[in-house]
Structure formats: structure tokens, C-alpha cells
């Protein structure tokens, strides 16, 4: 497996260098981002999934302890939600809730995004990862609050619809600010002339 991964990495670097030499910016961005995500995911998935799960659980638990609505047991990756009618409800924080995929996608796109310099990418990468983690914690908090208020019957609505919708909206906002807005500002717009005057 390691040999195959190394071989694929060498091929990826070689093809990427061809795109760079030919100045094919779009293919460099696309091929580079996808390749970086795949390699990082294969390498980091077994290493960071559990630590990230515990970290997200601990961060969410701070809010739970402050409000008294739920408690975090990071060793097991579980949030225990207090509900008067149904009793304690457990919410297991799995791989999806860890935020590893979302962070790797963001960092991979940012690495090959040509509108930033390297020192800018490092700073934005740190802020972006913190933003994704915060959005994830907020999503879990909203899910816990909904279950606390209305019981286990709203689990599907809270987790699958409301929680994901909130997380995706925050992620789209981050992507717009980092990528789309920057690209628009980088565009050169010619001057317009109206009634003989430049505007």
C-alpha cells in the first residue's frame, strides 16, 4: 500500500509539473487540489479521526456544561443530552462530525488557489480550519438544543436537515469570502467612458 501510494504521489507530482510548465492554471488547480485531498485523506484519516472527534466533543462540551443542556464524554465521543420527558439521549460523534473531510477539502483548494501568496495561504488556512471547527461545534450545539427541547423524535430533523443546512450555509459563506470574493476583487475591470468622461 505504501509503495503504491508513493508511486501515485510521484506520478501526481510529475503530471502537476507538466501543467505548471504549460501554464494550464485551471488544470493545475483542479488536479492539484483533488490529488492533495486524496493523499492527505489516505494518510491522515487513521491518524486524526479519533483526536478530532474528541476535540470537537470537548469543544461542544464546554457549551453544554455552561448551559447545563448536555454533557460531553470525549473518551467515548458521546454527548449526553438532558431531556425531561425522554430522559438522557446520547449523541455519538462519528467520522462525519469530526470535520476532517471539510478541513482537508478547504486546505487542498486553498493550497492551489492562485489568488493568494504563500504567507497569506498559511494565515487563511489557520483561520479557515478554526472557522470550520467552529461551524461544526455550532451545528452539534443546535442539534443538542433541539433534542433537549423536543426529545428524540426530532433527531432526524435536527441532525440531517437543520444541522447540515446550518453547517453548509456557514461553509458556503467561508468559501465565498475566501475564494469567490477574492477572485472577483482580483479581476481587472476596464474603465467606462460616459459623455466623454472616464468613470
Task: Put a short name on every predicted segment.
Residues 1-199:
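Hydrophobic N-terminal alpha-helices or hydrophobic patches in metabolic proteins across all domains
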